[in-house]
Protein backbone atom coordinates (compact mmCIF):
# COMPACT_ATOMS: atom_id res chain seq x y z
CA UNK A 1 0.00 0.00 0.00
CA UNK A 2 3.03 2.26 0.33
CA UNK A 3 3.99 4.07 -2.84
CA UNK A 4 7.59 4.72 -1.79
CA UNK A 5 9.73 1.55 -2.10
CA UNK A 6 12.44 3.19 0.02
CA UNK A 7 10.10 3.49 2.99
CA UNK A 8 9.82 0.49 5.30
CA UNK A 9 6.96 0.68 7.79
CA UNK A 10 7.40 -1.86 10.57
CA UNK A 11 5.27 -0.36 13.33
CA UNK A 12 1.93 -2.02 12.66
CA UNK A 13 1.24 -2.65 16.34
CA UNK A 14 1.00 1.14 16.69
CA UNK A 15 -1.28 1.61 13.71
CA UNK A 16 -1.85 0.16 10.26
CA UNK A 17 -2.26 1.84 6.90
CA UNK A 18 -5.88 1.98 5.76
CA UNK A 19 -6.47 -0.62 3.05
CA UNK A 20 -7.46 0.93 -0.31
CA UNK A 21 -10.63 -1.15 -0.53
CA UNK A 22 -11.59 -0.03 2.98
CA UNK A 23 -11.01 3.60 2.03
CA UNK A 24 -13.23 3.05 -1.03
CA UNK A 25 -16.05 1.73 1.17
CA UNK A 26 -15.76 4.74 3.46
CA UNK A 27 -15.68 7.20 0.57
CA UNK A 28 -18.77 5.65 -0.98
CA UNK A 29 -20.57 5.61 2.36
CA UNK A 30 -19.87 9.29 2.90
CA UNK A 31 -21.45 10.09 -0.44
CA UNK A 32 -24.37 7.68 -0.38
CA UNK A 33 -25.24 7.18 3.31
CA UNK A 34 -25.20 10.78 4.48
CA UNK A 35 -28.42 10.64 6.50
CA UNK A 36 -28.60 10.13 10.25
CA UNK A 37 -29.39 6.45 11.00
CA UNK A 38 -31.89 7.62 13.64
CA UNK A 39 -33.93 9.66 11.16
CA UNK A 40 -37.37 8.30 10.29
CA UNK A 41 -37.44 9.27 6.60
CA UNK A 42 -36.17 7.17 3.68
CA UNK A 43 -32.47 8.12 3.55
CA UNK A 44 -32.25 7.68 7.32
CA UNK A 45 -33.74 4.20 7.04
CA UNK A 46 -31.13 3.34 4.40
CA UNK A 47 -28.38 4.53 6.74
CA UNK A 48 -29.83 2.46 9.57
CA UNK A 49 -29.90 -0.60 7.34
CA UNK A 50 -26.25 -0.05 6.39
CA UNK A 51 -25.32 0.39 10.06
CA UNK A 52 -27.07 -2.84 11.00
CA UNK A 53 -25.28 -4.67 8.19
CA UNK A 54 -21.91 -3.35 9.37
CA UNK A 55 -22.70 -4.39 12.93
CA UNK A 56 -23.66 -7.89 11.81
CA UNK A 57 -20.46 -8.24 9.76
CA UNK A 58 -18.22 -7.26 12.67
CA UNK A 59 -20.20 -9.48 15.06
CA UNK A 60 -19.66 -12.46 12.76
CA UNK A 61 -15.89 -12.11 13.02
CA UNK A 62 -16.17 -12.23 16.82
CA UNK A 63 -18.78 -14.95 16.98
CA UNK A 64 -21.32 -12.88 18.88
CA UNK A 65 -24.87 -11.70 18.26
CA UNK A 66 -25.33 -8.38 16.46
CA UNK A 67 -27.13 -6.94 19.47
CA UNK A 68 -24.04 -7.65 21.61
CA UNK A 69 -21.79 -5.48 19.40
CA UNK A 70 -21.50 -1.74 20.08
CA UNK A 71 -19.55 0.71 17.95
CA UNK A 72 -17.15 3.08 19.72
CA UNK A 73 -14.39 5.45 18.64
CA UNK A 74 -11.46 3.15 19.48
CA UNK A 75 -10.20 0.31 21.64
CA UNK A 76 -9.33 2.67 24.47
CA UNK A 77 -12.88 3.94 24.65
CA UNK A 78 -14.17 0.37 24.53
CA UNK A 79 -11.99 -0.51 27.52
CA UNK A 80 -13.18 2.51 29.48
CA UNK A 81 -16.82 1.87 28.63
CA UNK A 82 -16.56 -1.79 29.61
CA UNK A 83 -14.71 -1.30 32.87
CA UNK A 84 -16.53 1.75 34.21
CA UNK A 85 -19.91 0.41 33.17
CA UNK A 86 -19.47 -3.21 34.19
CA UNK A 87 -18.46 -2.62 37.80
CA UNK A 88 -21.73 -0.81 38.40
CA UNK A 89 -23.60 -4.02 37.68
CA UNK A 90 -22.10 -5.72 40.73
CA UNK A 91 -22.89 -4.81 44.34
CA UNK A 92 -21.76 -7.97 46.16
CA UNK A 93 -18.11 -6.91 46.45
CA UNK A 94 -15.34 -4.48 45.55
CA UNK A 95 -12.57 -6.81 44.41
CA UNK A 96 -10.89 -6.32 41.02
CA UNK A 97 -7.99 -8.41 39.69
CA UNK A 98 -5.87 -7.18 36.78
CA UNK A 99 -2.57 -8.19 35.22
CA UNK A 100 0.45 -5.96 35.65
CA UNK A 101 1.09 -5.15 31.99
CA UNK A 102 -2.23 -3.82 30.77
CA UNK A 103 -2.73 -0.96 28.32
CA UNK A 104 -3.15 2.49 29.92
CA UNK A 105 -6.82 2.49 28.89
CA UNK A 106 -7.26 -0.39 31.34
CA UNK A 107 -4.80 0.79 33.98
CA UNK A 108 -6.14 4.33 34.33
CA UNK A 109 -9.84 3.49 34.77
CA UNK A 110 -8.91 0.93 37.41
CA UNK A 111 -6.74 3.48 39.19
CA UNK A 112 -9.78 5.75 39.31
CA UNK A 113 -11.92 2.93 40.66
CA UNK A 114 -9.30 2.25 43.34
CA UNK A 115 -9.62 5.87 44.47
CA UNK A 116 -13.37 5.32 44.68
CA UNK A 117 -12.93 2.49 47.14
CA UNK A 118 -12.56 -0.58 44.94
CA UNK A 119 -9.94 -3.12 45.98
CA UNK A 120 -7.73 -3.41 42.87
CA UNK A 121 -5.12 -6.17 42.92
CA UNK A 122 -2.40 -5.97 40.26
CA UNK A 123 -0.73 -9.30 39.48
CA UNK A 124 2.75 -9.23 37.94
CA UNK A 125 3.25 -11.25 34.75
CA UNK A 126 5.57 -14.21 34.50
CA UNK A 127 9.17 -13.62 33.49
CA UNK A 128 8.35 -14.55 29.88
CA UNK A 129 5.72 -11.81 29.66
CA UNK A 130 2.64 -14.04 29.85
CA UNK A 131 -0.19 -13.84 32.34
CA UNK A 132 0.46 -15.53 35.66
CA UNK A 133 -2.90 -17.24 35.52
CA UNK A 134 -2.39 -19.22 38.72
CA UNK A 135 -1.53 -16.07 40.67
CA UNK A 136 -4.53 -14.22 39.24
CA UNK A 137 -6.88 -17.05 40.13
CA UNK A 138 -5.56 -17.11 43.69
CA UNK A 139 -6.93 -13.57 44.07
CA UNK A 140 -10.43 -14.46 42.87
CA UNK A 141 -12.88 -14.93 45.74
CA UNK A 142 -16.51 -14.30 46.63
CA UNK A 143 -15.93 -10.52 46.62
CA UNK A 144 -14.26 -10.34 43.18
CA UNK A 145 -16.49 -8.46 40.76
CA UNK A 146 -14.07 -8.06 37.84
CA UNK A 147 -11.02 -9.69 36.26
CA UNK A 148 -9.34 -7.81 33.39
CA UNK A 149 -6.56 -8.91 31.06
CA UNK A 150 -5.27 -8.53 27.52
CA UNK A 151 -5.29 -11.36 25.01
CA UNK A 152 -2.13 -10.32 23.14
CA UNK A 153 0.40 -7.96 24.66
CA UNK A 154 0.89 -4.82 22.61
CA UNK A 155 4.61 -4.46 23.35
CA UNK A 156 6.08 -7.96 23.17
CA UNK A 157 3.30 -9.92 21.46
CA UNK A 158 2.79 -12.58 24.11
CA UNK A 159 -0.40 -14.54 23.61
CA UNK A 160 -2.34 -15.22 26.80
CA UNK A 161 -4.74 -18.09 27.40
CA UNK A 162 -7.65 -15.86 28.36
CA UNK A 163 -10.18 -18.56 27.53
CA UNK A 164 -8.72 -20.80 30.25
CA UNK A 165 -8.49 -17.89 32.67
CA UNK A 166 -12.11 -16.89 32.02
CA UNK A 167 -13.37 -20.44 32.52
CA UNK A 168 -11.50 -20.82 35.80
CA UNK A 169 -12.67 -17.42 37.04
CA UNK A 170 -16.28 -18.40 36.39
CA UNK A 171 -15.71 -21.72 38.16
CA UNK A 172 -14.54 -19.89 41.26
CA UNK A 173 -17.16 -17.15 41.12
CA UNK A 174 -19.81 -17.27 38.40
CA UNK A 175 -20.79 -13.65 39.07
CA UNK A 176 -17.31 -12.25 38.39
CA UNK A 177 -17.13 -10.21 35.18
CA UNK A 178 -14.30 -11.06 32.78
CA UNK A 179 -13.08 -8.24 30.52
CA UNK A 180 -10.60 -8.89 27.71
CA UNK A 181 -8.62 -6.30 25.77
CA UNK A 182 -8.37 -7.96 22.34
CA UNK A 183 -7.14 -4.93 20.41
CA UNK A 184 -3.88 -6.63 19.38
CA UNK A 185 -5.47 -10.07 19.07
CA UNK A 186 -8.38 -9.42 16.72
CA UNK A 187 -7.64 -10.80 13.25
CA UNK A 188 -4.38 -12.29 14.51
CA UNK A 189 -5.60 -15.14 16.70
CA UNK A 190 -8.95 -16.93 17.01
CA UNK A 191 -11.27 -15.45 19.62
CA UNK A 192 -13.71 -17.55 21.63
CA UNK A 193 -16.16 -15.59 23.75
CA UNK A 194 -17.14 -18.42 26.09
CA UNK A 195 -17.09 -17.07 29.68
CA UNK A 196 -15.96 -13.61 28.48
CA UNK A 197 -18.39 -10.81 29.35
CA UNK A 198 -16.84 -7.78 27.64
CA UNK A 199 -14.18 -7.53 24.94
CA UNK A 200 -12.66 -4.55 23.12
CA UNK A 201 -11.35 -4.24 19.55
CA UNK A 202 -10.03 -1.38 17.42
CA UNK A 203 -10.19 -0.48 13.75
CA UNK A 204 -6.83 1.11 13.12
CA UNK A 205 -4.99 -2.09 14.06
CA UNK A 206 -6.65 -3.98 11.18
CA UNK A 207 -6.31 -1.50 8.28
CA UNK A 208 -9.48 0.44 9.09
CA UNK A 209 -9.20 4.13 9.97
CA UNK A 210 -8.48 5.66 13.34
CA UNK A 211 -11.64 6.75 15.12
CA UNK A 212 -13.62 3.51 15.08
CA UNK A 213 -13.68 0.54 17.44
CA UNK A 214 -16.16 -1.84 18.97
CA UNK A 215 -17.16 -3.38 22.27
CA UNK A 216 -18.62 -6.82 22.76
CA UNK A 217 -21.05 -6.68 25.67
CA UNK A 218 -22.60 -10.00 26.58
CA UNK A 219 -26.37 -10.28 26.89
CA UNK A 220 -25.64 -11.42 30.44
CA UNK A 221 -24.71 -7.85 31.40
CA UNK A 222 -26.96 -5.66 29.29
CA UNK A 223 -29.89 -5.26 31.66
CA UNK A 224 -27.78 -4.09 34.59
CA UNK A 225 -25.04 -2.32 32.61
CA UNK A 226 -24.67 1.37 33.49
CA UNK A 227 -22.64 3.20 30.85
CA UNK A 228 -20.62 6.19 32.06
CA UNK A 229 -21.95 8.41 29.24
CA UNK A 230 -25.31 10.15 29.10
CA UNK A 231 -27.06 11.70 26.13
CA UNK A 232 -28.89 10.25 23.16
CA UNK A 233 -30.38 6.83 22.56
CA UNK A 234 -27.77 5.65 20.07
CA UNK A 235 -26.14 2.23 20.34
CA UNK A 236 -29.11 1.06 22.40
CA UNK A 237 -28.39 3.73 24.99
CA UNK A 238 -24.91 2.38 25.67
CA UNK A 239 -22.99 5.07 23.81
CA UNK A 240 -24.75 8.36 23.01
CA UNK A 241 -23.85 10.35 19.91
CA UNK A 242 -24.67 9.99 16.24
CA UNK A 243 -22.99 6.87 14.89
CA UNK A 244 -19.99 7.20 12.58
CA UNK A 245 -21.61 5.15 9.83
CA UNK A 246 -18.88 5.46 7.16
CA UNK A 247 -16.20 4.31 9.59
CA UNK A 248 -18.43 1.53 10.94
CA UNK A 249 -18.80 0.30 7.38
CA UNK A 250 -15.04 0.62 6.93
CA UNK A 251 -14.47 -1.42 10.07
CA UNK A 252 -16.79 -4.12 8.77
CA UNK A 253 -15.01 -4.16 5.41
CA UNK A 254 -11.58 -4.42 7.04
CA UNK A 255 -12.64 -7.19 9.42
CA UNK A 256 -14.38 -9.18 6.69
CA UNK A 257 -11.33 -8.85 4.44
CA UNK A 258 -8.86 -10.08 7.07
CA UNK A 259 -11.10 -12.85 8.38
CA UNK A 260 -10.69 -14.61 5.05
CA UNK A 261 -6.89 -14.68 5.22
CA UNK A 262 -6.00 -15.44 8.86
CA UNK A 263 -4.27 -18.75 8.11
CA UNK A 264 -2.23 -17.52 5.15
CA UNK A 265 -1.28 -14.32 6.95
CA UNK A 266 -0.12 -16.28 9.98
CA UNK A 267 2.18 -18.35 7.77
CA UNK A 268 3.62 -15.23 6.14
CA UNK A 269 4.11 -13.45 9.47
CA UNK A 270 5.92 -16.45 10.93
CA UNK A 271 8.33 -16.42 8.01
CA UNK A 272 9.12 -12.73 8.55
CA UNK A 273 9.49 -13.25 12.29
CA UNK A 274 11.93 -16.14 11.75
CA UNK A 275 13.89 -14.07 9.25
CA UNK A 276 14.25 -11.23 11.74
CA UNK A 277 15.16 -13.53 14.64
CA UNK A 278 17.83 -15.22 12.50
CA UNK A 279 19.18 -11.87 11.37
CA UNK A 280 19.45 -10.56 14.91
CA UNK A 281 21.70 -13.49 15.84
CA UNK A 282 24.49 -11.59 14.08
CA UNK A 283 24.43 -9.08 16.94
CA UNK A 284 25.73 -10.71 20.15
CA UNK A 285 24.52 -7.76 22.22
CA UNK A 286 20.87 -8.31 21.30
CA UNK A 287 18.48 -9.90 23.80
CA UNK A 288 15.10 -11.03 22.47
CA UNK A 289 12.21 -10.04 24.74
CA UNK A 290 9.39 -11.69 22.79
CA UNK A 291 9.12 -15.44 23.52
CA UNK A 292 9.05 -17.92 20.65
CA UNK A 293 5.33 -18.54 21.11
CA UNK A 294 4.39 -14.86 20.86
CA UNK A 295 2.23 -13.81 17.93
CA UNK A 296 4.53 -13.57 14.89
CA UNK A 297 3.43 -10.04 14.08
CA UNK A 298 5.42 -8.59 17.00
CA UNK A 299 9.10 -8.98 17.88
CA UNK A 300 10.58 -6.98 20.74
CA UNK A 301 14.29 -7.01 21.51
CA UNK A 302 16.88 -4.99 23.43
CA UNK A 303 20.16 -4.16 21.75
CA UNK A 304 21.78 -3.35 25.14
CA UNK A 305 24.01 -0.59 23.73
CA UNK A 306 22.23 2.44 22.33
CA UNK A 307 19.19 4.11 23.84
CA UNK A 308 16.05 3.33 21.90
CA UNK A 309 15.25 6.93 21.07
CA UNK A 310 18.70 7.40 19.53
CA UNK A 311 18.47 4.24 17.43
CA UNK A 312 14.91 5.03 16.36
CA UNK A 313 15.98 8.49 15.20
CA UNK A 314 18.81 6.99 13.16
CA UNK A 315 16.51 4.42 11.57
CA UNK A 316 13.88 7.05 10.83
CA UNK A 317 16.48 9.05 8.90
CA UNK A 318 16.84 5.95 6.74
CA UNK A 319 13.04 5.66 6.37
CA UNK A 320 12.88 2.59 8.62
CA UNK A 321 9.97 3.05 11.01
CA UNK A 322 9.77 0.99 14.19
CA UNK A 323 9.09 1.88 17.83
CA UNK A 324 10.38 1.31 21.33
CA UNK A 325 7.15 0.62 23.21
CA UNK A 326 3.44 1.30 23.07
CA UNK A 327 2.53 4.38 21.05
CA UNK A 328 0.08 5.26 23.84
CA UNK A 329 3.00 5.55 26.27
CA UNK A 330 5.00 7.97 24.15
CA UNK A 331 8.18 9.04 25.87
CA UNK A 332 7.67 6.58 28.72
CA UNK A 333 9.76 3.46 29.37
CA UNK A 334 8.09 0.13 28.72
CA UNK A 335 5.95 -0.81 31.70
CA UNK A 336 5.59 -4.30 30.23
CA UNK A 337 9.32 -4.97 30.32
CA UNK A 338 9.49 -3.43 33.78
CA UNK A 339 6.70 -5.71 34.98
CA UNK A 340 8.63 -8.67 33.54
CA UNK A 341 11.62 -7.72 35.69
CA UNK A 342 13.90 -6.58 32.87
CA UNK A 343 16.80 -4.40 33.98
CA UNK A 344 16.89 -0.66 33.17
CA UNK A 345 19.38 -1.09 30.30
CA UNK A 346 17.15 -3.64 28.57
CA UNK A 347 14.18 -1.31 28.97
CA UNK A 348 16.06 1.75 27.73
CA UNK A 349 17.34 -0.04 24.60
CA UNK A 350 14.18 -1.94 23.63
CA UNK A 351 12.90 -1.89 20.05
CA UNK A 352 9.59 -3.26 18.80
CA UNK A 353 9.23 -4.42 15.20
CA UNK A 354 5.68 -5.27 14.14
CA UNK A 355 4.50 -6.69 10.83
CA UNK A 356 1.40 -6.77 8.68
CA UNK A 357 0.56 -8.71 5.52
CA UNK A 358 1.94 -5.92 3.34
CA UNK A 359 5.45 -6.37 4.71
CA UNK A 360 7.99 -8.38 2.75
CA UNK A 361 11.36 -10.06 3.31
CA UNK A 362 12.88 -6.96 1.71
CA UNK A 363 11.53 -4.87 4.60
CA UNK A 364 13.27 -7.15 7.09
CA UNK A 365 16.52 -7.05 5.11
CA UNK A 366 16.36 -3.26 4.98
CA UNK A 367 15.80 -3.08 8.72
CA UNK A 368 18.69 -5.43 9.51
CA UNK A 369 21.06 -3.57 7.18
CA UNK A 370 20.21 -0.16 8.58
CA UNK A 371 20.23 -1.50 12.13
CA UNK A 372 23.76 -2.80 11.58
CA UNK A 373 24.79 0.60 10.23
CA UNK A 374 23.22 2.25 13.25
CA UNK A 375 25.00 0.01 15.73
CA UNK A 376 28.38 0.73 14.13
CA UNK A 377 27.81 4.45 13.68
CA UNK A 378 26.24 5.18 17.05
CA UNK A 379 28.73 3.10 19.03
CA UNK A 380 31.57 4.94 17.30
CA UNK A 381 30.04 8.29 18.26
CA UNK A 382 29.49 7.14 21.83
CA UNK A 383 33.17 6.22 22.16
PLM feature spans:
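Pyridoxal 5′-phosphate
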Residues: 1-383
Amino acid sequence: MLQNPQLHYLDNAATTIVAPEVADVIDKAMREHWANPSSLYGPGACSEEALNAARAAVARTLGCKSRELYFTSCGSESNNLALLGAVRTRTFGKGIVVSGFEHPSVQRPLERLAKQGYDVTVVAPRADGTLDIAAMLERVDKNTILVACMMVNNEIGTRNDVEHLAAEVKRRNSRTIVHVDAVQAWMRVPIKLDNIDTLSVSGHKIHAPKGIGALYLSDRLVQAFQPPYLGGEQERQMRPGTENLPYAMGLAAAATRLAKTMKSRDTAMRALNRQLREGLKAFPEVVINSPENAVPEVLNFSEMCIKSETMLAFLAEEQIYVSSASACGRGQPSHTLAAMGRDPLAIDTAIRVSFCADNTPEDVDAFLNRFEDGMKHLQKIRK
